Design a protein with these regions (language model features):
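Acidic, surface-exposed loops and disordered segments
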Residues: 4-198
């Protein structure tokens, strides 16, 4: 995986979140939310983002291809530019101190010696990207941060802004920051609606 770092910022670790210093995995899962309002007074350092992405490198991928790449907006100029590329989410993430563009390199996962391994093809790249992003949002929560994965984004403008190669698919923009309020927990489906035992 690659980390594109654009600038450094505040190094503080104080977050005021409800998570403990060493939350259990269950605590991380149950406290993670898609956060749509961030605390503008709290910043995240480049070093903290690097620690986050380093942990994400342990995510599984097809034949260890590691197709996911990250482009990190952390400078005021790049943050403002990306905010204009996320459609209706602009107002929701205007106070997030970090915005991360997630991509995957096509022709890696789902391929062997350049040939598509099964009918899913490059869908495996998207699958592996989702696994990496799952690691990202869970590790972020373990670090006391909050996230929002946004599928609404202008891929062409993001590609130009970050000089993203043409062989990478722009999947999502992920905001990273501290929640300004406690979000509600959406209702989940009944377990029997999503699993069958045989």
């Amino acid at each position: 995986m690659a980390l594109l770092s654009l600038s450094s910022c505040y190094n503080g670790n104080s977050n005021g979140n409800a998570t403990s210093a060493n939350p259990s995995f269950d605590e991380v899962i149950t406290s993670r939310r898609s956060v749509r309002k961030y605390d503008a007074s709290k910043k995240i350092s480049e070093a903290e983002v690097r620690d986050l992405i380093k942990a994400v490198q342990d995510a599984p991928s097809w034949a260890n291809q590691q197709p996911t790449k990250y482009y990190v907006a952390i400078s005021p100029e790049k943050l403002a530019a990306v905010q204009d590329m996320v459609g209706g989410n602009k107002e929701r993430i205007k106070d997030a101190p970090v915005l991360i563009v997630s991509t995957y390199e096509r022709g890696k996962s789902g391929f062997f010696q350049g040939e598509q391994s099964n009918e899913v093809g490059d869908g495996w790249g998207a699958y592996d990207n989702g696994l990496s992003n799952c690691y990202l949002v869970l590790k972020a929560r373990a670090m006391g941060f909050d996230t929002l994965i946004m599928g609404m984004r202008d891929a062409d403008k993001l590609r130009e802004l970050f000089s993203i190669p043409e062989n990478e698919t722009v999947m999502a923009v992920i905001s990273l920051g501290y929640r300004a309020e406690e979000p509600n927990r959406p209702e989940r489906k009944n377990l029997d609606e999503i699993v069958k035992f045989f």
